Amino acid sequence: MADQNQVVRAAGVLMAISVLARLAGFIREQAIAAQFGTTMATDAYVVAYTVANIVYLIIGGALATVFIPVFASYLTGSNPVDAKNKNDYRQQNHLDRRSAWNLASTIINLTVLVLGGVTIIGIAVSPWLVQLIAPGFAPEPEKVQLTTQLTQIMFPITLLFALSMLFGVTLNTLQHFAVPALGSVVFSLTVLASVFTLGATWGIKGLAAGTVIATVFQVAIQVPVLWRKGMRYSLVLDLKHPGVRQIGVLMGPVLLGNAVAQAYVFIERIIASHLAEGCIAALNFANKLYLLPFNLFALAINIAIFPTMSAHAANNDLAALRKTTFGGLKLVGLLTIPAMVWLIVLAEPIVRLTFERGAFDDHSTGLTTFALSFYVLGLFALGAFNVLNRAFYALHDTRTPVLISIFTVLFNLAMALILVRYLQHGGLALAAALAANLNLILAYYFLRPRLPNWRGRELFAPLGKIVLASGIMGAGIWVTARCLIQLTGGSTGLMAQLLTVGIASSVGLIIYLGLIWWWKPDEELVEMVRKMGQRVVQRVRG
């Protein structure tokens, strides 16, 4: 119960802040859409951001994933590697945090050295990177030149994002979640400000510069909190620390898996660069909408439960790890399955309401809605897969997720090459959704024998009720939306879309909450949501 309350408190804090973060992020995307639309400049910005961000996603993402379990084991004094290296650290009391902070300082310094060097090299070879990732831009030299310049401006975010994530997961391990989550709010607000300041003066290049400034702020706000939590940074490079070696061993498979996953992102951009102008931007805007429920609900849950899962695994309490994993899966389903239905039924009015203004016209809405309708089919799978993935990582098993990723990326690529012929950019979105569902199926299959007392009925019975409640909710939303569209005469104006989305969503929410409360798919789940709701309200009220 104590672990459950800890997860609920953490998830509640994260969701409360996520409400602010997603609101800020949406206003940011609205501003970018209104200022630049689905134009050549936006396509160039998206590709440049991808090039600059991809190295961080490969290296920084892998580092953050394996750092939490190792760092947590040093904080709790239960690191199995240390027990085999008593000659090196015989006098070290791991309940004293000096060894943990020594490990953290070494990893931070290695990150600066490695990704700092990668940034310098990346800026130098940007012209070739752009040709590699967007060969379809070649017939338009102006577009290639602009993309190259934007890539060179934004390449420092490779290092800055990695530091931000490393600081964030360190604080998460210490059960502090608020400030790392607030980092995305600071990032979005800074980028938003740059749209109207630097962007208004220097166009898309100003937006690129503002993106870099935003990542600097995202890193900076976490430093004082780390210090208050007891971190004592030092210019140490202790490569003999057993934790460093352990991270190195664990990181290899994750690095490979991330590289494979990001290779697909490269390939997707290559394919999309050959499509009509605006398709890359439309995929980007649709992806932002699709990931809204994931970032707001599923990601918050995953971040909140990972330290708890790591602690259970470190203590070899596999029964508790299974229970936490099941709780995470059910909570993800409770929140993302109705969100899937909501986005499917109201896709077009949501896109119009969110983006259609300024340079983002009716054509842009059509492109974005088409992609969104396919992306959203993978929403629950994406959130649930992340829960299962973290269970593997908590068990220090990085090999299985990598093998799964390699297989599903190849599947994703094959589907994309087939579907893009018939659905254009929608084919890329559908391929991603199919791959997300395959990821979930494989992860479930391979994790099941690893944890004791795995009872599928305990998981699928409540999820079945959630699916049924979501379907009835979707029918209510559809009927309400059709009536409102008739009442407004099919108007695409802002107020008409606001009424349609607002009223239909409210009706759907009432139906869904009523059915969930009536059917009670899982008593423990309902209690967790009740506590989480109280926590969110408390945080929002301050």
Give the positions of each predicted feature.
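Membrane-embedded alpha-helical bundles of multi-pass transporters/translocases
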Residues: 1-542
